[in-house]
Amino acid sequence: IDRSRGLGDVYKRQPSKDLLKDIEIIVFDLQDVGVRFYTYISTLHYVMEACAENNIALIVLDRPNPNGFYVDGPVLENSFKSFVGMHPVPIVHGLTIGEYATMINGQKWLNNGNICSLKVVTCLNYNHSIRYSLPIPPSPNLPNMMSVYLYPSLCFFEGTDISVGRGTDFPFQVFGSPNLKEGKFKFTPISKFGAKNPKHKGVLCVGNDLRNINIDSLN
């Protein structure tokens, strides 16, 4: 709990009835990056679930999607549903957080087909054909636009022995492992804000640095 504000933690969990007992409206304002396993949309689902079950109105403040100019990747199979993938959508889904909330309602993905009382405050003058550069990093491990663009691809390495640079100044812009024998780049992950115990902490990793690639050549 945030003791200074009395706000509860809803990460990886649905808000409890006790937490919501004096609440009439919830305002959801998070910067998503348009990727299925970036878990802000899972948190959104849990919040919508709780709002639907407790007759609480939800206001979503929409934001541009920095990866909203394309759609890519396979659709999730329901048998693999988890907190890092809750819905049958592509890896890069192309929607803003407000559009995604509307889809959750429209597809009746909430428990028992419940519908959340939802109001989306839309973005003015935004369209998906224009790339949007984020003015503020959405999280400590996505510190710049290169990391945001590479995240949909490099995140798959997190299920392997490969480090994606957590615990460095360039997460999701490099990759490597102590077990790789060849590579043009070396780095050693350390404990940092947002990466207290990164993979291969304190161990030299060999791999590649992607910070200077032409991101357009990957699409």
Protein language model regions, located:
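Structural motif
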Residues: 24-25
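Internal helical hairpin/lid segments
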Residues: 145-219
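A short, aliphatic-rich alpha-helical micro-motif
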Residues: 4, 20-21
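Conserved anion/nucleotide-ligand pocket segment
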Residues: 81-154
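A short helix->loop->beta-strand "cap" motif at the edges of active sites that frequently abuts
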Residues: 53-57
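Glycine/threonine-rich flexible loop motifs
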Residues: 32-44
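Single conserved hydrophobic/aromatic residue that forms the stacking wall/gate
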Residues: 1-11
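Glycine-rich, charge-decorated loop segments at or immediately adjacent to ligand/cofactor-binding or catalytic sites
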Residues: 59-81
